[in-house]
């Protein structure tokens, strides 16, 4: 049996402390250490990595990359150099981090879809808006762009402070002179610890004009600045919807801007159109955008797209979305805007370092700090030039003395054993300074003897003027402002361009589909089996009385037309079912069809039960006007307040409680003192005041309206407010107009009086309508044929007559229903444009 090793006892805290005495290890609270270390790390990320300086708009990695290129002569007028060479210089001298981090920084500054104004001129594959990566740095070449020179110009004139690099072997600028307002024009984005920045790009011309406005009046308001600086201007163009977000971030430094793709609707022939997207929102990956649309179509979350393809090229973006025939392109676009990156929100957070401290800045503060930086650069540059001018004039003064005494100067130099003796001798003889004697001694004798006294005097006089001018600049603030403004004008002239992003003022990014649908008159038809469709009113010809008609509704062999009405695309349509329930749709929500199409069954677009069918439809424009007047096939009537039907749930609600064997025939909107007309299949019509039926609750059954016998049933209803005549139409195509005053006013519940002499020639009374002479009628037959005619062309005849022929019928064809509407007459010669919609 093996012996177990004795367990080592754990050291106590005191024993550990004793062992640590005299060592370099210090005892520290873990809580305090974590707090201190994390704070140090956070500040390092904020100040030295993630946030831009408000003066030049750069993070350290961008600043170091640009300075390294400038230092190595990689300017726009020099040949391209390998990107790997550039990256190596940055890493080796200034930025000891990963090569890919530095390379991606350079790549982004060369991408025209990322930068509003390119700072790097790239040669080779620098990535694409589809998210393609740039080629490896060993393959690509780059150099600074023309505008980058403005950022670094005068850096050699002590305009900015230099600091040691990471190992104190080199000096790097703490900030760039930035003669070009980079932060405002190119923007930036970055995530620090506990904070993030997201500054949008703006148009250079507008930014320069805004800075000039501030330079000339430091009390300029943000509203006045907005007269020059309109808002963001993104490299990818697109449109900004509304200016409320712009106003907010201009004033507070924070806000949200809605960016929407720019598009055109093109006709692609055969009655079809395509949505062509030409500009997309900033920072949107085009490939991912297309993939998202495909995903939504595949999952049937978006319907109405027949084809999608990317035809983008070097000339620009072109995403083609082919639209199905039965889809309104603006409505489809609105859905795409809501569900895809075709519309995005840019959340602005103007966070930048001000004297090393992170601050959220409004637009005026950003302009202010940039302007103050330019004043400082100008002053430091002027001081540098002044110092150099004074040094030069001092040298020129010495050279003038030397030329005036050239023989003696040469004699002293030749007689001296070395430069030190010569310098002392010249100083002693001519009262020169060491700088002057040094300049004299550094010249060859030939050059010294060749100096022209007149040229020296001219240079001296010029230097006097230069010094005077430079001193005036330093002492005159107005001159400093003017110089800054002149530089801004130079930037506008050389680099200014037109705005790419259009701002849509006074609009909302939240647009309902209906806002995009034009208000148009429509015809809604319903078949006996419950098939519905919507057609433009102009689908039908206006024909004279007795015309043959056009095919208006294609139905199944055992189906025929039941109802037809006229409304518009924005009208509320209340669908009343045989079970006494009501459902609501807008006119444009009814499936669109053509003259020959079958239509769509109600169960496909209404939440009805399988045993339920729609019997009538009522268009409503205003729920505050009047009542609803219900009539059933058995002559039961009910009056209800229209406002009770304004709020209808998605699954509908009860409209009337029906007795066994009865069904709803019609629902009319009354105005409070209307006279009601009800026609029966026996040819009788009753006329009574609507107030004979008191208003009842929504689920009430109602009272008797007309006295019917045996198998008689209601065939038509109307109101006195509808017109001056009763239009009566028989099943055989005969009809007539009769003055409403020919019908005596009775109480509800009576049998009524005869309106159509029913016989084999007329057939049963099919429908009655109350009309006026300015209206028009659509008459629809059991075969689906439709004729449109003017009421004024129908004869006015007495009550107890058969009428005249309104429509020519074939074989066993009969009149099924009629609809009345107001419409400008269309001449017989006018051709109709066939709307060949393909319903799926």
Swiss-Prot record:
GO molecular function: ATP binding; DNA binding; DNA negative supercoiling activity
Topo IIA-type catalytic domain residues: 51-516
Gene name as annotated: gyrA
A Gene Ontology term for the protein's cellular component: chromosome
Record's subunit section: Heterotetramer, composed of two GyrA and two GyrB chains. In the heterotetramer, GyrA contains the active site tyrosine that forms a transient covalent intermediate with DNA, while GyrB binds cofactors and catalyzes ATP hydrolysis.
Motif (GyrA-box): 543-549
Note: Few gyrases are as efficient as E.coli at forming negative supercoils. Not all organisms have 2 type II topoisomerases; in organisms with a single type II topoisomerase this enzyme also has to decatenate newly replicated chromosomes.
Protein's name in the database: DNA gyrase subunit A
UniProt subcellular location: Cytoplasm
Primary site of residence: cytoplasm
Root EC class: isomerase
SMART domains assigned: TOP4c (SM00434)
